[in-house]
């Protein structure tokens, strides 16, 4: 479950901008929001906003002052990275850092929000140890949580430590996000009590800003209960922001991903890739299962699919109850390719066998008998089999005399009519024509 008691999202969504009247949010109004959140008791105020260009209305000093006076605040930075095609193929080089404007950057903390999508999905955040060490810049969620806990983050030997919290990264320095289970019927975190609209901390408080502290707290008692002591993330889920990503649990807004990452670290329950030995054992079992299935004479494809379903169910079980992730896509692709390859091989083998049977026996056996053998080649047993049979022999009585009275053309016509009739009788009983001897069959 999400940590509603520790994390709050303030959302500048569609409804907010409809009432606000313009987009994006003016920096003097961001300053008001920061000041109001601090007065409401927010422990940390993290703005998920890129402010790398100076404000055209000279409002940066106003926001810088609000950030500085509010204490634990932070803004977004972006790492300009030269990344290899695949993260395991080489080192990522830093070509610079896009920070907020100088006056804002000097007034607050920063964290990078670069994301790495794998397979078209965002499921983890990446750490860059050399960049962190040289430039002292951490992933946004890590920096926010470190400020909330009043600790300095550290990364040693692949283990992230935040005070009493510690969690291992994977071999590529990724922290896997444990996306929370939302209440039934809800799609986004913004639909839960973890999120309030920015209307409540900006427009709704306009008439209260000039009140003294005691009166302000009295008038905002309910709102203060939602904000006080929390790590507050301010972000934009409006359609204009395009800040939404595909994840293993569906579409998730960028600010929600930050919140989910913070919650994952607070619970010390990051999703972990299964150990290599464990994964190798499962793959061996899967391989043996496929080998056993390939020996079946019937329903092998159905059993193949059953094995795949069982494997997927095991993956889901370990993911939900133990936080372990197996390499699901590669084995499943391998399974399907194996199934297709085996079926193609068997099809070609069967086709070759059928071609041989038809070629070898088409001159001797009736089509019905050939079809029977093609359907069940095991009927061709060396040594034969004992059964009751009928021997059919027929010829034309006095053929020599008859043939002498006919022209060659008439004789051929007679033989064709006669032998054809005899063959039809034999075929009607699924018989086999052994040979023709003149007028005899």
Residue ranges and their predicted role:
Residues 1, 264-368:
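Transmembrane alpha-helices and their extracellular/periplasmic helix-loop junctions
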Residues 1-170, 226-295:
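Non-transmembrane functional regions of envelope-associated proteins
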Residues 9, 46, 176, 232-235, ...:
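Structured core elements
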Residues 156-217:
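Substrate-access "cap/lid" subdomains that shape
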Residues 257-260, 264, 286, 355, ...:
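Feature representing long, continuous alpha-helical segments
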Residues 364-382:
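Cytosolic juxtamembrane regulatory segments of multi-pass membrane proteins
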Residues 380-441:
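Catalytic NTP-binding/metal-coordinating core of nucleotidyl cyclase/transferase enzymes
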């Amino acid at each position: 479950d999400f940590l509603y008691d520790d994390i709050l999202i303030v959302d500048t969504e569609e409804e907010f901008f409809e009432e606000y009247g313009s987009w994006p949010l003016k920096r003097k109004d961001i300053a008001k929001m920061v000041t109001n959140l601090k007065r409401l008791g927010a422990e940390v105020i993290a703005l998920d906003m890129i402010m790398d260009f100076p404000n055209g209305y000279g409002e940066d000093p106003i926001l810088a002052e609000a950030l500085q006076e509010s204490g634990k605040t932070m803004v977004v930075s972006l790492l300009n990275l030269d990344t290899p095609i695949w993260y395991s193929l080489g080192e990522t080089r830093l070509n610079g850092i896009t920070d907020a404007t100088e006056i804002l950057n000097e007034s607050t903390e920063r964290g990078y929000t670069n994301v790495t999508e794998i397979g078209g999905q965002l499921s983890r955040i990446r750490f860059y140890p050399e960049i962190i060490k040289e430039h002292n810049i951490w992933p946004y969620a890590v920096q926010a949580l470190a400020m909330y806990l009043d600790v300095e983050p550290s990364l040693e030997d692949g283990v992230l430590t935040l005070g009493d919290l510690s969690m291992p990264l994977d071999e590529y320095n990724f922290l896997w996000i444990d996306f929370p289970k939302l209440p039934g019927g809800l799609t986004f975190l913004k639909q839960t009590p973890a999120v309030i609209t920015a209307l409540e901390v900006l427009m709704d408080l306009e008439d209260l800003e000039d009140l003294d502290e005691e009166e302000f707290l009295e008038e905002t008692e309910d709102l203060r209960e939602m904000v006080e002591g929390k790590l507050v993330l301010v972000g934009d889920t409006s359609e204009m922001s395009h800040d939404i990503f595909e994840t293993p649990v569906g579409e998730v807004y960028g600010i929600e991903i930050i919140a989910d990452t913070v919650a994952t670290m607070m619970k010390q329950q990051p999703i972990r890739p299964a150990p290599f030995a464990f994964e190798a054992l499962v793959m061996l079992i899967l391989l043996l299962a496929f080998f056993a299935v390939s020996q079946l004479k019937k329903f092998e494809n159905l059993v193949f699919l059953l094995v795949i379903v069982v494997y997927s169910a095991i993956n889901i079980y370990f993911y939900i109850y133990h936080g372990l992730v197996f390499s699901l896509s590669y084995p499943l692709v391998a399974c399907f390719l194996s199934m297709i390859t085996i079926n193609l091989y068997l099809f070609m083998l069967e086709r070759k066998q059928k071609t041989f049977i038809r070629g070898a026996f088409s001159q001797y056996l009736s089509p019905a008998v050939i079809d029977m053998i093609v359907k069940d080649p095991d009927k061709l047993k060396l040594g034969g089999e004992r059964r009751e049979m009928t021997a059919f022999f027929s010829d034309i009585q006095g053929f020599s005399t008859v043939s002498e009275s006919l022209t060659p053309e008439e004789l051929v016509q007679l033989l064709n009519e006669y032998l054809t009739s005899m063959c039809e009788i034999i075929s009607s009983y699924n018989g086999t024509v052994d040979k023709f001897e003149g007028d005899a069959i």
